[in-house]
């Protein structure tokens, strides 16, 4: 599943192409995604100029003068920039939506159709008040994200610290791979109750989350089976993981075998020696 680094890599790859360019037309081939593509979506965007592309959590927000179209990649979705030949490149089975510009096509592909393409009109207020965005936690690269925030929001919580990171109500974008890697960097065992982690340890964890996500973005995102960047190249952060998907292999710091457990139906990896 594309997480924050994959979505940010996609945003950075796409924005230079689309910002300041007009959508000539939109072809919606499959309206039934996770939520239906709004009726009249293609007509609403015809001849609209894309002003900018933002990211909120795992949502991409494309601003035009009349509002925003919102794209969520779901579990297997990708956005690709393709040359706009005459005619445009023929769509494949899972290519559901095309935004056609003068020189290129922005194509949304999603084999499992858990992604979404939505519309938020400007007269409905700021896009960040959209029901899917309003309850999200803070951005990990924002000034609001800190060890003090993690500490304060987890007092009395018995859920594990890893599950608290994944929940998304405190901080967004820390998916399964990045939670395991961040906890390793911070030296915190993932099974520790969130409410029992001290403020100094949460300060280390906040720093580790930012560093882990920044490294992933720099390296192009994780090599998830279904993730492909906007230029068609797979990311490769997973090749540098300290613990994720390395069960039984020696820890790169101390040499102890990496352990694998299941938390909330997801695999967790940690070093029993480095993480306490």
Swiss-Prot record:
Listed EC numbers: 3.2.2.23, 4.2.99.18
GO process terms (BP): base-excision repair
Cofactor note: Binds 1 zinc ion per subunit.
Family matches, as InterPro entries: DNA_glyclase/AP_lyase_DNA-bd, DNA_glyclase_Znf_dom_DNA_BS, Formamido-pyr_DNA_Glyclase, FPG_cat, MutM-like_N-ter, Ribosomal_uS13-like_H2TH, Znf_DNA_glyclase/AP_lyase, Znf_FPG/IleRS
Binding residues for DNA: 94, 112, 157
Keyword line: DNA damage, DNA repair, DNA-binding, Glycosidase, Hydrolase, Lyase, Metal-binding, Multifunctional enzyme, Zinc, Zinc-finger
Single Gene Ontology MF annotation: 8-oxo-7,8-dihydroguanine DNA N-glycosylase activity
Cofactor: Zn(2+)
One Pfam assignment: Fapy_DNA_glyco
Zinc finger (FPG-type): 242-276
Catalytic activity: Hydrolysis of DNA containing ring-opened 7-methylguanine residues, releasing 2,6-diamino-4-hydroxy-5-(N-methyl)formamidopyrimidine; 2'-deoxyribonucleotide-(2'-deoxyribose 5'-phosphate)-2'-deoxyribonucleotide-DNA = a 3'-end 2'-deoxyribonucleotide-(2,3-dehydro-2,3-deoxyribose 5'-phosphate)-DNA + a 5'-end 5'-phospho-2'-deoxyribonucleoside-DNA + H(+)
Record: active site: 2 (schiff-base intermediate with dna), 3 (proton donor), 58 (proton donor), 266 (proton donor)
Subunit comment: Monomer.
Similarity comment text for this entry: Belongs to the FPG family.
Purpose of the protein: Involved in base excision repair of DNA damaged by oxidation or by mutagenic agents. Acts as a DNA glycosylase that recognizes and removes damaged bases. Has a preference for oxidized purines, such as 7,8-dihydro-8-oxoguanine (8-oxoG). Has AP (apurinic/apyrimidinic) lyase activity and introduces nicks in the DNA strand. Cleaves the DNA backbone by beta-delta elimination to generate a single-strand break at the site of the removed base with both 3'- and 5'-phosphates.
NCBIfam families linked to this entry: fpg, PRK01103.1
Protein name from the UniProt record: Formamidopyrimidine-DNA glycosylase
Organism, scientific name: Burkholderia pseudomallei (strain K96243)
Lineage: Bacteria, Pseudomonadati, Pseudomonadota, Betaproteobacteria, Burkholderiales
Chain's gene name: mutM
């Amino acid at each position: 599943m594309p997480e924050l680094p994959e979505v940010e890599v996609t945003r950075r790859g796409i924005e230079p192409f689309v910002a300041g360019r007009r959508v000539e037309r939109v072809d919606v081939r499959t309206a039934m995604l996770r939520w239906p593509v709004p009726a009249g979506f293609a007509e609403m965007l015809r001849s609209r100029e894309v002003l900018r592309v933002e990211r909120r959590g795992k949502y991409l927000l494309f601003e035009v003068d009349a509002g925003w179209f919102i794209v969520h990649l779901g579990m297997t979705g990708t956005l690709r920039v393709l040359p706009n030949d005459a005619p445009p490149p023929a769509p494949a089975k899972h290519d559901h939506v095309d935004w056609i510009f003068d020189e290129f096509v922005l194509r949304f592909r999603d084999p499992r159709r858990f992604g979404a393409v939505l519309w938020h009109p400007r007269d409905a207020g700021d896009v960040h008040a959209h029901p899917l965005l309003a309850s999200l936690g803070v951005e990990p690269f924002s000034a609001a994200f800190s060890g003090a925030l993690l500490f304060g929001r987890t007092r009395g919580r018995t859920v594990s610290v890893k599950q608290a990171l994944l929940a998304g109500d405190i901080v967004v974008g820390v998916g399964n791979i990045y939670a395991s890697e961040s906890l390793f960097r911070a030296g915190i065992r993932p099974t520790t109750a969130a409410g029992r982690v001290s403020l100094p340890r949460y300060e280390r964890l906040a720093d580790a989350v930012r560093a882990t996500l920044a490294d992933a973005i720099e390296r192009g995102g994780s090599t998830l089976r279904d993730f492909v960047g906007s230029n068609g190249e797979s990311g490769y952060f997973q090749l540098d993981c300290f613990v994720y998907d390395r069960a039984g292999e020696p820890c790169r710091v101390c040499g102890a075998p990496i352990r694998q457990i299941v938390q909330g139906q997801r695999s967790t990896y940690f070093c029993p020696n480095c993480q306490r």
